[in-house]
């Protein structure tokens, strides 16, 4: 059984892969590119061909099937937002809704999206007058910092405790998910509504075009 599997996506697949190799050389890195239609099948085949004691999902929206979950052991996901922001919109809603804080959430993965028990939360004050590109960079940096901390602590564990340690951490954590889940379609509807109600909203000029053109 391979100790670790890391499933991630661009744009953080390269730095995430380097961290994995630093702390767990020889572990399995799977990079899922949602822009490539065949990629999901490739990732699925690789997951079904192995078994892992501990699996990490990092900065990607890959949804694991029940069959895949059975091969992944204990699964941890680093969600690039606070528990109050479930689903998509983690790098846009805090700006649109003028949140005072942002953060990242480490949680166990189950068959639902962003419902697994929370292990820990990193929370930061929102900088003044921050714009979308800078905010996205901040969340990515904080996500990578949490990934490195996770790998450091896991490296210090005996092999037999790779999963049990993180499950026990989740049982002790008091943080809970809150708020409604926002899908990709829901985010598209929200952005279209914003462009109609406030066409001069500054974030509309900062967002990449593909977010604004997604079908509702």
Predicted regions and their residues:
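Donor/substrate-binding cores of folate-linked one-carbon enzymes
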Residues: 2-10, 19, 56-193
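Short, charged/polar "capping" segments at the starts of alpha-helices
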Residues: 12-16, 38-41
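C-terminal active-site/capping subdomain that shapes the small-molecule cofactor and substrate pocket
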Residues: 15, 188-216
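A short, Lys/Arg-enriched amphipathic alpha-helix followed by its capping loop at the start of a domain
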Residues: 15-27
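A short beta-strand-loop structural module common to alpha/beta enzyme folds
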Residues: 26-41
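Short, flexible loop segments at the rims of nucleotide/cofactor-binding pockets, characterized by
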Residues: 31-35, 52-56, 82
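Short amphipathic alpha-helix with an adjacent loop that forms part of the alpha/beta core around
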Residues: 39-51
